[in-house]
Curated annotation (Swiss-Prot):
Pfam families in the record: TerC (PF03741)
Protein topology in the membrane: Multi-pass membrane protein
Organism annotation: Salmonella typhimurium (strain LT2 / SGSC1412 / ATCC 700720)
Source species taxonomy: Bacteria, Pseudomonadati, Pseudomonadota, Gammaproteobacteria, Enterobacterales
Domain of life: Bacteria
Name assigned to this protein: Putative membrane-bound redox modulator Alx
Protein's job: Has been proposed to be a redox modulator.
Residue intervals passing through the bilayer: 7-27, 44-64, 90-110, 114-134, 136-156, 199-219, 226-246, 262-282, 287-307
GO CC terms: plasma membrane
Family label: Belongs to the TerC family.
Residue ranges that the UniProt entry lists as topological domain Periplasmic: 1-6, 65-89, 135, 220-225, 283-286
InterPro entries attached to this UniProt entry: Integral_membrane_TerC, Integral_membrane_TerC_rswitch
Keyword vocabulary terms for this entry: Cell inner membrane, Cell membrane, Membrane, Transmembrane, Transmembrane helix
Length: 322
């Protein structure tokens, strides 16, 4: 697999991730189960975005010094584009988590604990998926067309789908887990397992954690091929992807109280998926430059947020008039 990643770059990335996760887990252990405040969520979100941009700047500087700007510029731009794509698509994942926590009545103080382990699991699973996907593409280049068609289909499906938490309990995964795990009827504080009468029982909190991991895998099937449309370099795909999801937990608590204010966002994400799908399908006829792709994705998100703000304004105006 061709990659710009050197041992120094891989090592630097690993050190940053391990240090930040260690700090996060240490704070979680000291404070115990508690809900992240809006102020804390905003602070952590800003920190993760800043850290991602600083990493990209260091990445660009290293490549510029070792291989020249003709290599550094497009690679740093590819990281930024991949990061923006993953960050925007991750918002839809946040809304699914909201439905899961609401359906299973998980208190805010326990949601953070679930998401800590959820993000750790996502790091492992996505790393495996990215390396497997990169290897498959290098062996079977025609898979890019399959990914493109899949993203096109997914984009249309996302625009037409209706979000409803009432059907979560009937999903095959939930029914299978409930049928095969000895499980308590209620959440037992912050425990995933408890002992009763000498027997080990899973709690509904474990079920929620498994569903959080499962939902992330489903969304990764969309987002990882989307980044492959920008670059197939495993270093850039992995680092941009993981930096985006490392800030996902903070993003969840930032958006959890205002999710209903982003009703138009899924349509913007759908358009992004359709654009990326088309980009992959026409690659043999016309190669869309990375800078153009970044501009299109950023433009779609900006237009979507403007429309969303207008819709919210009209809705609020109607409510005030009643």
């Amino acid at each position: 697999m061709n990659t710009v990643g050197t041992p120094l770059l891989w090592g630097g990335f690993a050190v940053v991730v391990v240090i930040m996760l260690s700090i996060d887990l240490l704070l979680q252990g000291r404070r115990g189960a508690h809900a992240m405040s809006m102020k804390q969520a905003a602070g952590w979100s800003i920190l993760w975005v800043t850290l991602s941009l600083l990493f990209n700047a260091a990445f660009w500087w290293y490549l510029a010094e070792t291989q020249g700007r003709e290599v550094a510029d497009p690679q740093a731009l590819a990281f930024l584009t991949g990061y923006l794509i993953e960050k925007s698509l991750a918002v839809d994942n946040v809304f699914v988590w909201l439905m899961l926590f609401s359906y299973f009545s998980v208190p805010p103080a326990l949601q953070r604990r679930v998401l800590v382990y959820g993000v750790l699991g996502a790091i492992v699973l996505r790393t495996i998926m990215i390396f497997a996907g990169t290897w498959l593409i290098t062996q079977f280049e025609w898979l890019l067309y399959v990914f493109g068609a899949f993203l096109l289909f997914t984009g249309v499906k996302m625009a037409l789908a209706k979000e409803d938490e009432s059907g979560i309990g009937e999903k095959p995964m939930v029914r299978w887990l409930r049928g095969h795990l000895r499980m308590t009827d209620t959440i037992e504080n912050e425990h995933f397992f408890v002992r009763k009468n000498g027997l080990l029982y899973a709690t509904p909190l474990l079920l929620v954690l498994i569903m959080v991991e499962f939902s992330d895998v489903i969304f990764a099937v969309d987002s990882i091929p989307a980044i492959f449309a920008v670059t197939t370099d495993p270093f850039i795909v992995l680092t941009s992807n993981l930096f985006a999801i490392l800030g996902l937990r903070a993003m969840y608590f930032l958006l959890s109280g205002v999710a209903e204010r982003f009703s138009m966002l899924k349509y913007g994400l759908a358009v992004i998926l359709v654009f990326i799908g088309i980009k992959m399908l026409i690659v043999d006829f016309y190669h869309i430059p990375i800078a153009i792709s970044l501009g299109v994705v950023f433009g779609i998100l900006t237009i979507t947020l403007v429309i969303n703000a207008w819709v919210n304004h009209q809705r609020d105006k109607k409510l005030r008039a009643q």
